[in-house]
Amino acid sequence: MKKKKIIFSSLLFCAATLPVAAQNDFNYNEDSQFRPQTNRKVNTDSLGSDKEIPKGIRVWTVDERFGDTKAAVVDTLQHMYMNSTFTEGLRGEYNTLGNMGTARLNRIFIDRRNTQGNFIFTEPYDYIVNPVSDFHFTNTYSPITNITLNSCGDKVTGEDDFKAIFAVNANKRLGAGFRFDYKYGRGYYNAQSTSHFKYTMWASYLGDRYQAHLLFSTNHEKMTENGGITNDDYIKHPEIYTESFATNEIPTVLEQNWNRLDNQHIFFTHRYNVGFSRKVKMTEEEIKAKKFAMASKKENAEEEAKEEARKKAKEQGKKFDEKAYDKQQRAKFSGRPDGAKIAGDEPAKDLAAKDIRNDSTRIAVNGKAAADSLLAIQKKNAEDSLFYKSEYVPVTSFIHTVKFDNYRRIYEAYQTPADYYLKEYYDAGRLTGDSIYDQTKHWHMKNTFAIAMLEGFNKWAKAGLKAFASYDLRHYELPTMEGGFEKYNEHALSVGGQLSKQEGKTLHYNAVAEIGLTGVDAGTLAIDGNVDVNIPFLGDTLQVRGDAFFHRETPSFYYRNYHARHLWWENDLDKTIHTRIMGTLSFPKTRTKLRVAVDEIKNYTYFSQSYDITEEGLRTGVIVTPMQESGGINLLTAQLEQNFRLGILNWENQFTYQHSSKESVCLLYTSDAADE
């Protein structure tokens, strides 16, 4: 029944959006504005009431803590589009289970998220559960609809990726939209199918004094777990078997096992700006547009006046002489008629006798040339004043951001192999015996209040400054041995500040510090910073960028506490200390980018899994334990990107080298190469 509802809803959506779909070729300009190129001829309305529809879209991202906006580039059907649906990433940098929609992990350590999430089960699915900072808000000149379907394979092993986006603006300040994503991978091996649904809605209001962004998403992820194939020789040495196997015929460790994730997210940030208004000159494009509007208005007024004169002549039974009318209108602006006299009294004799040359209150105009020059200056000043606009300059902002996340994870299994798990802690709840129904819930609410002194409101304000306070409330539910649920609540209060400079062309920097005051995160410290210098070099810009952070943070709740049918732990872990220093050198002219990073981690937390393998290739005695490495781990990463282009030929290369001082704890790929 659910499947029928989904199909019906999809058909209804397609039917509703088809009338507004346009057959256009799209492109974006240097201002990140998406503009359809309509070069084909279109039949016009026979009534002559056609209106030119404005085209274009602007997108941006927002900071998850403060709601600061940053211009972004619109996604287009251009660079690397053919790889955009791959779970492996654009350049194959992720390890996956081979199927669309499976869990994944980035092989490049410096490209992984810096901090552990509160709900670790969704981290391997970051292509569905995206961070707020990656989302593109929209401002469109006219409604935008985009529907995309990528499909491959057949009914047995096929994959489908469907995406539908609609965005619209009520006016130039208020915009909204929605997006629907559906990923379905049947899998190439037994019990490997995946299914992901995601629905997103957003809205934004960008006024001079008040600004707000709202983002809502609800996700459902369902993955079939097979535990891997029973013997790697089916792949590595198929010749040792007397019969051949298709991939979906190779025996797997588990069957009828599902991992389900349901999560909802609400993000809302708004601010009130206090500042002043000032007159600034319009841009060249705005001046051209205003001149065109003024000329059009004048022309329309003249046409209306002529039409009114024509109607009046018709009512009076007279013939309308258009040439005489036009001559009369031109005469109105040709100056004073010949023989015109100046009316008024003659100046008083005492005033006439006054030496005007010695009058400091009057402007001396010597000759006709000087008078003409003065009149020209006055006319130019009057014209220039028309091309200034009022701009509101914010000085101080009062910011509030709230974020609410709700999660549920269910692991449901039937026909679990005998002795597969080492321990069993209880046999109660929804499923018993050889069946498993593990469930955990979590919700998290975070409020942040900030006061900002903004950058650039005058020539002395070279940087922006913010002070903020955040309060976290986290709720968790874990099963008990009696079949019920045990509830946990964690509170955390933190304060911090930010110093940043984003305007200008040569130097930019950003530094944020946050310290935990109370609750489970008391004593935590997070310092993040980056700086970039842009140097003109060989007709282009050489950018040198530095990034660094120091994080002392509490390990995620699920590293410290977890209850399930066959897994159970309650640990008191030390805070993890992670330091990174990274430098980046970029030169667009040679299409070169070099990154070098050094990491040091103390009290690194990870999961350790152990099991035995029988002669038949089955697993027994499976156990998972959270571990913490008290010593330090040093990591080195060096990455070179070098791209080449010759006419229509394009060759992109990325080479990465990594080294870990303790591979038994933090194992990394030593080298990784990708080329397109």
Region locations from a protein language model:
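A generic structural signal for short, non-catalytic loop/turn and secondary-structure boundary residues
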Residues: 15, 140-142, 391-393
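Bacterial Sec-dependent N-terminal signal peptides
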Residues: 1-27
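Terminal non-domain segments
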Residues: 4-5, 9-10, 249-251, 321, ...
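Exposed, low-structure sequence patches enriched in small/polar residues
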Residues: 216, 252-314, 319, 368-672, ...
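Intrinsically disordered, low-complexity segments
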Residues: 7-8, 15, 358, 364, ...
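Membrane-proximal, glycine/serine-rich, low-complexity loop/turn segments characteristic
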Residues: 23-267, 271-323, 327-346, 351, ...
